Structures are given as structure tokens and as C-alpha cells.
Amino acid sequence: RAAALIGLIGASSIVGRLGLGALGAKVGPIRLMQAAFGVMASSYAIWLAADGRYGVLVLFAVVLGVGYGGFIALSPAAVAVMFGTNGMATILGATYTGAGIGGLIGPPLAGAIIDSSGFNAGITYALITAGVSTVVLYTLPVARVAQT
């Protein structure tokens, strides 16, 4: 059943990539990307509330997948709107390097938190981190740079 949840995150990510990517082309990628981050943060609250109930875990997987897929699809467009296309590869490289560092540090940190304080503490940490990140994203000024 756990493997099915992982697969569901991946399938929902496709929906997020295609759906939010297309919507971003119509309404603008920046605020929609910020919303996708908020959706990911809310997924951890759903996971925390699941208390082992599989149906709620399915909801968590779908919400996380859609939010994550939207973030992946909208990031390059948001960078282009905010910074223009000159140097876009460098900016995206820095952005994805930051994500890679999180991917490197996150799992051992989560493991240490779970080992010392329990599974729910690990989920709570993820919720707090994602929530703070969402707030920070919403406080950033949204300036548009002329295309070059």
C-alpha cells in the first residue's frame, strides 16, 4: 500500500505539471507557483492528521503530488518573468542546486528527528519548514523584468 501512495504522488505530479503549467501560462506563473508551495505545505498537515487512515493518506499523496508538479512546471516560467531570459540557465541552476542541497540534508535530518522524537515530529518539522517557506515566498516582491 505504501508503494501505491508513492506512485500516486508521481501520477498526481503529472497532473500538477500539466494542469498548473497550462494555467500558469494564462494567469501568470509567479503567484500560482507560490500557491503550489502552499499546497505542498498543506499536504503535510493532511499527512499529520491521517493517523494511519489510508484514505487520508491517499488525499495527502494527491495534494503533495499536484503541488510538487506545479512547482516544477512553474519554476522556469517564474524565473523568466522575474529575471528575464538572459542568464536564466544560471539562475535555474542555482535554484535547483538549492533544492539539491535540501534533498541532501533533508533525509538524514528527518531520520534524526524521527529517531529522537518520533514519526509525527518528522512530519511536523516538514510542515513547519514548508509553511515558513510558503510565507517567505509570499512576502517576496513580484517584479517583472522586461524580456531581453
State each model region's role:
Residues L23-G24, L109-G118:
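Interfacial helix-cap and linker-helix signal at transmembrane-aqueous boundaries
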Residues A2, L32, I91, I113, ...:
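Alpha-helical transmembrane segments of multi-pass secondary-active solute transporters
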Residues R17, G103-G111:
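Glycine/proline-centered helix-kink
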Residues V79-A89:
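Paired intracellular helix-loop junctions of major facilitator superfamily
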Residues R1, G7-S13, R17-L20, G24-V81, ...:
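C-terminal transmembrane helical hairpin of 12-TM major facilitator-type secondary transporters
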Residues G93-G106:
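Glycine-rich segments within core transmembrane alpha-helices of 12-TM secondary carriers
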Residues L140-T148:
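Intrinsic disorder in cytosolic terminal tails and internal cytosolic loops
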Residues G122-T139:
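Symmetry-related core transmembrane helices of the 12-TM Major Facilitator Superfamily/SLC fold
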